[in-house]
């Protein structure tokens, strides 16, 4: 039986009354966002809106993005990536559990020096996935060209974010490439491995 989204008590500033709000709303008040599922358009729109709101409220404070995601849609992930680059607030990315595929890309997209992982986290990079079903050959060719274009763009961005050569990124992402938190640090996808919130 699923437990659902937990609720926690929250007192609005200046109020004597407590209200029960879902845990994600309460964390959002503290500028803590959570990517804990596959990346899709709905998740991306929600995270983009929250980052834009928090940035407009106070761009001098960091936004904390916790990531435990198997990855997902490239286009949805790029909307989150572009927003991380767009906002004035520093975006601290924290891997808890797994950051795979687009999840790893977003982990590496955080503010340099502020990309961290917990000790037992796993990070996985690979080339973008594309699938075709019974379609015309010309449509398959168009889709293949677009996937190759996206692959090059993602690999160039990973190269910039990690400091690894484009050629190394291309080779490593040809298949699933798993890294421990320490290995991800050595690779340049994150800056530190942490075990306490004050270290982020």
UniProtKB/Swiss-Prot annotation:
Its main location: cytoplasm. One of its GO terms (biological process) is protein quality control for misfolded or incompletely synthesized proteins. It catalyses: Hydrolysis of proteins to small peptides in the presence of ATP and magnesium. alpha-casein is the usual test substrate. In the absence of ATP, only oligopeptides shorter than five residues are hydrolyzed (such as succinyl-Leu-Tyr-|-NHMec, and Leu-Tyr-Leu-|-Tyr-Trp, in which cleavage of the -Tyr-|-Leu- and -Tyr-|-Trp bonds also occurs). The keyword Cytoplasm applies. Keywords: Cytoplasm, Hydrolase, Protease, Serine protease. The keyword Cytoplasm applies. Its EC number is 3.4.21.92. The active site is at 101 (nucleophile), 126. GO terms for cellular component: cytoplasm; endopeptidase Clp complex. PROSITE patterns: CLP_PROTEASE_HIS, CLP_PROTEASE_SER. It is found in: Cytoplasm. Disulfide bonds: none annotated. One of its GO terms (molecular function) is serine-type endopeptidase activity. Belongs to the peptidase S14 family. Fourteen ClpP subunits assemble into 2 heptameric rings which stack back to back to give a disk-like structure with a central cavity, resembling the structure of eukaryotic proteasomes. Cleaves peptides in various proteins in a process that requires ATP hydrolysis. Has a chymotrypsin-like activity. Plays a major role in the degradation of misfolded proteins. PANTHER family: ATP-DEPENDENT CLP PROTEASE PROTEOLYTIC SUBUNIT (PTHR10381:SF70). This is ATP-dependent Clp protease proteolytic subunit 3. It comes from Synechococcus sp. (strain CC9605).
């Amino acid at each position: 039986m699923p437990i659902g989204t937990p609720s926690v008590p929250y007192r609005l500033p200046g109020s004597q009354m407590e209200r029960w709000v879902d845990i994600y709303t309460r964390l959002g008040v503290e500028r803590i966002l959570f990517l804990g599922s596959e990346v899709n358009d709905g998740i991306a729109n929600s995270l983009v809106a929250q980052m834009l709101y928090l940035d407009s409220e106070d761009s001098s404070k960091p936004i904390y993005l916790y990531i435990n995601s198997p990855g997902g849609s490239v286009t949805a992930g790029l909307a989150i990536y572009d927003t991380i680059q767009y906002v004035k607030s520093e975006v601290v990315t924290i891997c808890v559990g797994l950051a795979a595929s687009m999840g790893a890309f977003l982990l590496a997209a955080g503010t340099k020096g502020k990309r961290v992982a917990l000790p037992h986290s796993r990070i996985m990079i690979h080339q973008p996935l594309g699938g075709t079903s019974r379609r015309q050959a010309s449509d398959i060719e168009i889709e293949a060209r677009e996937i190759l274009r996206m692959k090059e763009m993602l690999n160039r961005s990973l190269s910039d974010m990690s400091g690894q050569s484009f050629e190394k990124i291309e080779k490593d992402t040809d298949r699933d490439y798993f890294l421990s938190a320490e290995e991800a640090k050595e690779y340049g996808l994150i800056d530190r491995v942490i075990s306490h919130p004050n270290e982020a």
